[in-house]
A protein has these predicted regions:
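Alpha-helix capping/helix-boundary segments
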Residues: 75, 97-98, 124
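Gly/Ser/Thr-rich phosphate-binding loop
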Residues: 63, 85-93, 102-169
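Conserved S/T- and glycine-rich ATP-binding loop of Class I adenylate-forming
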Residues: 6-9, 42, 48, 83, ...
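Active-site phosphate/pyrophosphate- and oxyanion-stabilizing loops and adjacent acidic/basic residues
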Residues: 4, 28, 99, 129
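Conserved AMP-binding/adenylation subdomain of ANL enzymes
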Residues: 24-41, 49-89, 104
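Short hydrophobic "strand-cap" motifs at the C-terminus of beta-strands
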Residues: 3, 33, 45-46, 71, ...
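Short beta-strand->loop structural element characteristic of the AMP-binding/adenylate-forming
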Residues: 14-17, 44-45, 66-73, 140
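Conserved AMP-binding A3 loop
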Residues: 1-25
Length: 169
């Protein structure tokens, strides 16, 4: 049995029970969902007590026989040096991590890395486009529930809904 701490999206963070069988099944199925194979180097800057790091990176990488590169903590300053050091091809993120990375000063060699794709939550449409342009890495946004059985993922070719509302009188 594994206790995962939820993000607290709907209230206070809480411990959710996850069986070893569920984690193993998620690892096997998420290899295809996140396009993780044996040749990938999966960079994990997020804490392993969170479902994103465990279910979208660690378990699929383990199932695929890929390499996992861990860091002590997320650092926007250390992100690109770590990615280059490990020759990372995939990573996961949560919250505002992408905007923090994009907030670092640009360099002409930002795209000089091995990253191909990443999975996470809460990056704005503008940040998704900027990250691809700057680093050459496609971000896939999704939402899952640590204690639930489902995952919502945006199709790679889907258009995002506009986040504005106009009222008429």
């Amino acid at each position: 049995m594994l206790l995962l701490l939820t993000s607290g999206t709907t209230g206070a963070s809480k411990a959710a029970i996850c069986s070893q069988g569920r984690l193993a099944a998620l690892g096997a199925s998420n290899c295809a969902k996140y396009d993780i194979g044996r040749a990938d180097v999966c960079y994990c800057p997020m804490p392993l007590f969170h479902g994103n790091a465990l279910m979208a990176l660690w378990a699929p990488a383990l199932s695929a026989g890929a390499t996992i590169a861990l860091t002590e903590r997320f650092s926007a300053t250390g992100f690109l040096p770590d990615v280059r050091h490990f020759a990372a091809t995939y990573f996961t993120y949560v919250g505002k991590a992408i905007s923090y990375i994009l907030g670092r000063p640009e360099s002409a060699d930002d795209a000089d890395n091995h990253l191909t794709h990443a999975f996470g939550t809460e990056a704005s449409p503008e940040d998704v486009a900027a990250f691809l342009h700057r680093f050459g890495c496609r971000l896939v946004e999704g939402y899952g529930s640590s204690e639930g059985g489902g995952l919502l993922r945006q199709a790679p070719d889907a258009r995002r809904a506009r986040s504005e509302c106009r009222a008429r009188a």
